[in-house]
Amino acid sequence: MIVIPAIDLFDNCAVRLFKGNYEEKKIYSSEPWKLAESFAKNGATLLHLVDLNGARNQLGVNEDSILKIRETTSLKVQLGGGIRDKEKLAYYDKIGINRFILGTAAVTNPDLLKYALDNYGKERVVVAVDARDGIVKIAGWEKDSGIHYRDLLERLVKAGIEHIVFTDIAQDGTLAGPNLEAYREILNSYPFQVIASGGIASLKDLMDLSSLKTKISLYGVITGKALYEGKLDLAKAISSI
């Protein structure tokens, strides 16, 4: 299991939301590329980068920051938020983004999902499954899809998806701990390489996730707020897992 630091971009700043609420966001840095550099120095190999403006269909707002992060860090970057057409995929491929995260498009545009798989390969396509009370949320977590996450996971198996990020939105940004039961269920029921996201507050949370007794082990875990609030030491976390 790998530890994956996160940067969520809103208006070119690194922010964290509370339970996905844009009205409850906290700004941590106006120079997010410096955060990425510090993550690399502390031993991270992969960065989870989210364009929150893009997720709400406010396209292009964070492009300068995304490009600067890509140009200044040695980290591999997986990027999501607003990837809803072939042109955006092609642009991010051109600037060197390593993995593309599709959330809304994976629910509403299966043709684009197939296109991404066919043209960029299964290792570079990740689907974000973001759920609140079991129902998948889309469009920056602001709209209900009407689909239970289990039904979406079944679709993704049939589509040939291998990598997912699963977020329990009710835990995200709360530092209240991860939803262990949800991850236990998914890892025992589906063949995905799963990245856990939401609620991580301590090294104990990471250890609890890494020690789940499941058919498939977690591929990775995303942490953001715990790093920014000083509750989790990235270098120690990486060396401990």
From Swiss-Prot:
Keywords: Amino-acid biosynthesis, Cytoplasm, Histidine biosynthesis, Isomerase. The active site is at residues 8, 130. It catalyses: 1-(5-phospho-beta-D-ribosyl)-5-[(5-phospho-beta-D-ribosylamino)methylideneamino]imidazole-4-carboxamide = 5-[(5-phospho-1-deoxy-D-ribulos-1-ylimino)methylamino]-1-(5-phospho-beta-D-ribosyl)imidazole-4-carboxamide. Its main location: cytoplasm. The keyword rRNA-binding does not apply. The keyword Metal-binding does not apply. Signal peptide: none annotated. It is found in: Cytoplasm. GO terms for biological process: L-histidine biosynthetic process; L-tryptophan biosynthetic process. Belongs to the HisA/HisF family. NCBIfam families: 1-(5-phosphoribosyl)-5-[(5-phosphoribosylamino)methylideneamino]imidazole-4-carboxamide isomerase (TIGR00007). This is 1-(5-phosphoribosyl)-5-[(5-phosphoribosylamino)methylideneamino] imidazole-4-carboxamide isomerase. It comes from Leptospira interrogans serogroup Icterohaemorrhagiae serovar copenhageni (strain Fiocruz L1-130). The gene is hisA.
